A protein has these predicted regions:
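Short catalytic/ligand-binding loop motif for oxyanion handling, primarily in non-cytosolic enzymes
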Residues: 3, 76-78, 178
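Homeobox/homeodomain signature
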Residues: 4, 14-25, 90, 130-133, ...
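Hydrophobic "anchor" residues
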Residues: 6-8
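C-terminal active-site rim and adjoining tail of enzyme catalytic domains
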Residues: 43-46, 121-206
């Protein structure tokens, strides 16, 4: 935020999912806190407000929830973002409970150099010409491909797992593709419908 708070939000600006306008980097936390970020989705979510990163970490620590945190720093630059995220995680001793990802692979390289104890993942949504060479040069722990890329290039599973990397795929919202990703051996499925995913995973495991 303008006053240096780390907040949880999907977009760089607030228009799409709130009753406000403007970029988060140009707004103070108090200004953001005045926004309703739930009503756009459904009246039952009206009155929801933006959380700080610290609030989310505290919730995850209390509930023992594993957290996949995406840094949204590929469109807007946020100074010292990596170190500030690391500081918040480490002061709560949650290095093994959080893994961090981004489409900004340079940021993830820097993050891993600053803190080898926190797992990092590289998000991507387009094929690479020479992925084998790319992962050889990477210090990331995980790969986060869009699920269709694993269907288009099934050999990627063997490549990533052969390098000791976890494969966490996104965003899988329908049952057939959930089953397909499980069958391919992915380590994690990111979905907008966790209730459906849990049911599918239970059915497959049974």
């Amino acid at each position: 935020t303008k006053d240096g708070k780390l907040v949880i939000f999907h977009d760089a600006s607030v228009e799409r999912t709130s009753n406000g306008t403007g970029f988060i980097k140009d707004m103070t936390y108090d200004e953001l806190l005045s926004l309703d970020i739930g009503a756009w989705k459904s009246p039952e979510f009206a009155g929801q407000h933006i959380w700080t990163f610290g609030q989310l970490l505290d919730f995850c620590k209390e509930t023992k929830m594993l957290l996949n945190m995406e840094l949204k720093n590929y469109e807007v630059f946020y100074e010292n973002l990596e170190q500030r995220v690391i500081d918040e995680i480490c002061k709560r001793q949650m290095q093994e409970q959080v893994f961090v990802s981004s489409f900004n692979h340079i940021s993830m390289q820097h993050f891993k150099e600053l803190c080898p104890d926190i797992e990092t993942g590289l998000l991507y949504d387009k094929p690479y010409l020479d992925m084998e060479h790319y992962v050889q040069r990477s210090n990331a722990d995980n790969m986060h491909p869009r699920y269709m890329l694993l269907q288009y290039q099934p050999e990627l599973m063997e490549l990533f797992h052969g390098r000791g990397m976890k494969v966490n795929t996104w965003t899988v919202n329908d049952e057939e593709n959930m089953k397909d990703m499980i069958a391919r051996g992915v380590d994690c499925i990111i979905s907008n419908h966790p209730d459906v995913l849990c049911r599918v995973a239970d059915d497959v495991c049974d």
